[in-house]
Amino acid sequence: MSLLTEVETYVLSIVPSGPLKAEIAQRLEDVFAGKNTDLEALMEWLKTRPILSPLTKGILGFVFTLTVPSERGLQRRRFVQNALNGNGDPNNMDRAVKLYRKLKREITFHGAKEIALSYSAGALASCMGLIYNRMGAVTTEVAFGLVCATCEQIADSQHRSHRQMVTTTNPLIRHENRMVLASTTAKAMEQMAGSSEQAAEAMEVASQARQMVQAMRAIGTHPSSSAGLKNDLLENLQAYQKRMGVQMQRFK
């Protein structure tokens, strides 16, 4: 796996699923391929994206700044600086300085990532902030190692939280989660269907599913009534894709 592929993988792992994630993936691909060279416009676009947490925006801004060539005097962006200040916690800053001293002696991506993984996400973000604000300089490979370690820490905690929700025995939470997943699957079907004539059927199925979820929410239903809703939708989606000649091995 190439270095940039690895960076893209880690960064995208902390971006919430949805149309915005696809857009960010495209931007990252363009940046890494050297197709997008306007850092100013890229940062302005990132700043105004909804849904993303300030820290995720900060990490993306850091990656864009590392990758896109820019004039030496280009102004640092406040939204990235604020996100990478470790919540203003002096302990995070102390640890970030210690980590920075270790990273300065490192030259490889994997070496930097290994060192960084023993620090908390707050200290890692602060260390990125030091580098972003030009208070410290490391090689681009080392900076990417720091980025990937930070994303791994965040993705780990997101995964723990997600696992807790998925394994919860509370029927109300499970019911709502199934309806949310069905709704987002329906939305994805509508987007994939596009405007072709064969898409009418998929659009119809998706629309019915969304209306059903809205009705279930409006009138209140038994927690088991949503069981199988998402799977039914996915089966419809896969049947539609087969007819369209699109093969999607793993959607579930």
Curated annotation (Swiss-Prot):
Segments for region (Membrane-binding): 1-164
Matches recorded under InterPro entries: Flu_matrix_M1, Flu_matrix_M1_C, Flu_matrix_M1_N, Flu_matrix_M1_N_sub1, Flu_matrix_M1_N_sub2, INFV_M1
Chief localisation class: virion
Keyword hit for DNA repair: no
Keywords on record: Host nucleus, Membrane, RNA-binding, Viral matrix protein, Virion
Gene3D superfamilies associated with the record: 1.10.10.180, 1.20.91.10
Motif (Nuclear localization signal): 101-105
Membrane topology listed for this record: Peripheral membrane protein
Annotated region described as RNP-binding, given as residue ranges: 165-252
Cell compartments where the protein resides: Virion membrane; Host nucleus
GO BP annotations listed: viral budding from plasma membrane
Note: Most abundant protein in virion. When expressed alone can form virus-like particles in transfected cells.
Family in the record: Belongs to the influenza viruses Matrix protein M1 family.
HAMAP family: INFV_M1
Subunit: Homodimer and homomultimer. Interacts with NEP. Binds ribonucleocapsid by both interacting with genomic RNA and NP protein. May interact with HA and NA. Cannot bind NP without genomic RNA.
Purpose of the protein: Plays critical roles in virus replication, from virus entry and uncoating to assembly and budding of the virus particle. M1 binding to ribonucleocapsids (RNPs) in nucleus seems to inhibit viral transcription. Interaction of viral NEP with M1-RNP is thought to promote nuclear export of the complex, which is targeted to the virion assembly site at the apical plasma membrane in polarized epithelial cells. Interactions with NA and HA may bring M1, a non-raft-associated protein, into lipid rafts. Forms a continuous shell on the inner side of the lipid bilayer in virion, where it binds the RNP.
Name of protein: Matrix protein 1
